[in-house]
Amino acid sequence: MSSDRTSVVVSKRDAGGFEYPFAASCHPGREVTEQRTLAWVRRLRLVPDGRSLSRLKATNFSHLAAWLLPSASTQTLQLASDFTAVLFLLDDAYDEGQLSTDPESVEWLNEKYLGELFGYTEADMSDPLTRGMLDVRERIRRSHPHFFLNRWLSHFQYYYEANLWEANNRKQMRVPHLEEYLMMRRYSGAVYTYCDLLELLLERPLPLEVVQHPLIQTVRDICNDILCWTNDYFSLGKELTNGETHNLIVVLRNECVSTLEEAIDRLKDMHDRRVAEYQGVKEKVLALWADDEIRLYLDAVEAMIAGNQRWALEAGRYSGLESLIVRAG
C-alpha cells in the first residue's frame, strides 16, 4: 500500500513526558483529514448540533490519528480519523452521565451495538453512533480481507465489554485491584483495534501464523500497555476532578497506600521497563523474520507509541499535573 511521507518530526525526548529510543512523526495531511472527518460527521448527523461538533473538534481526534499512523495512505488515515471520532463519541456516551454508573443499560446497549456490528440484528439507523460505526465497518469490509475485518471487530468487542466492567465498578464505587486493572485496561483503551489498523500500512494484513505468534502478541501487548498507561498519566488531572477511579495512578495509590507522587513514580518505572522489554522483543522478532513487512510493522508500532505521547502533549492534557501532585499527594 502506498503511503504519504511525513513532514513533522519531533525529538526523542518531549519535555515533561516519557523518553523513547525512537522519534514521533506526524502525517502531513492531518488538517485536510480533519476537515473531511468533520464533514463526514455532519453528513451522517453523528452529533446533534454545532456545539457538540465544536466539542468533538476540540479533542483533536484527527491529529491523534495523524500522530498514530504517520506513514498511512490518505485513505487509511481518513479511516482511522473517522473511527477515532466515533470512538471519542462512544467514550463520552459510556463514561459521562447516567450511563457511566448504569451497568444494566450498558449491557443492553452493548448487545445492540455488537449485534449490529456483527450483523446479528437489524441495524437501528436512527442511532447516530450506529450510523458511524457501520460506515467504518463497511469501508473496512469493502477494501480489506474478511479475516482482517473479523480480527478488528473482535478487538472492538472487547472495548464494549470493558465499558460494562467499568460501569459495574462505578456503581459499586469500587477501585479495581492492580492485576485486574492491568488486564482490563488493555481492552478499555481500544488500542488493539489500532494495532490492527497498523496492518493496513503493509501490502497485506499479517497472516495468522505471524499475528498470533507469541513474540508479535507481546509487541502488541507492550504497545497497548504503554499507550494506556501514558494516557492515564496525561489524563490524571481530569479524572481526579471527575472522581474517575479507572486510572493506573489511582489504582497504584489505592493498592500500595502511597501518595499520588509515589504512584506516579511507580507508573513511570513500569513504563520504562516496558520500553526496555520492547527493545529486547524487537531483536528477537527481527532475528526470527528477515522480512521487510515485519520491520515496517515494528516501525509503525514505534511511531504509534511515540506519537501518542506527542498528541497528548499537543492537546494540553499535561498542563497542571505538578500542581495537582502538590494538592492531592
From Swiss-Prot:
Binding site for Mg(2+) 1: 91, 96
Keyword NAD: no
EC number: 4.2.3.164
GO MF: metal ion binding; terpene synthase activity
Keywords: Lyase, Magnesium, Metal-binding
Membrane spanning stretches: none
GO annotation, biological process: terpenoid biosynthetic process
Co-factor: note: Binds 3 Mg(2+) ions per subunit.
Cofactor names: Mg(2+)
Pathway terms, separated by semicolons: Secondary metabolite biosynthesis; terpenoid biosynthesis
List of residues binding substrate: 185, 238, 317-318
UniProt keyword annotation of Lyase present: yes
InterPro entries: Isoprenoid_synthase_dom_sf, Terpene_cyclase-like_2
Motif DDXXD motif per UniProt: ranges: 91-95
The reaction(s) this protein catalyses: (2E,6E)-farnesyl diphosphate = (+)-eremophilene + diphosphate
UniProt family annotation: Belongs to the terpene synthase family.
PANTHER family: BETA-PINACENE SYNTHASE-RELATED (PTHR35201:SF4), TERPENE SYNTHASE (PTHR35201)
Role summary: Catalyzes the conversion of (2E,6E)-farnesyl diphosphate (FPP) to yield the bicyclic sesquiterpene eremophilene via a 1,10-cyclization, which requires the abstraction of the pyrophosphate from FPP to yield the (E,E)-germacradienyl cation. The only accepted substrate is farnesyl diphosphate (FPP).
Domain notes for this protein: The Asp-Asp-Xaa-Xaa-Asp (DDXXD) motif is important for the catalytic activity, presumably through binding to Mg(2+).
Protein name: (+)-eremophilene synthase
Protein source organism: Sorangium cellulosum (strain So ce56) (Polyangium cellulosum (strain So ce56))
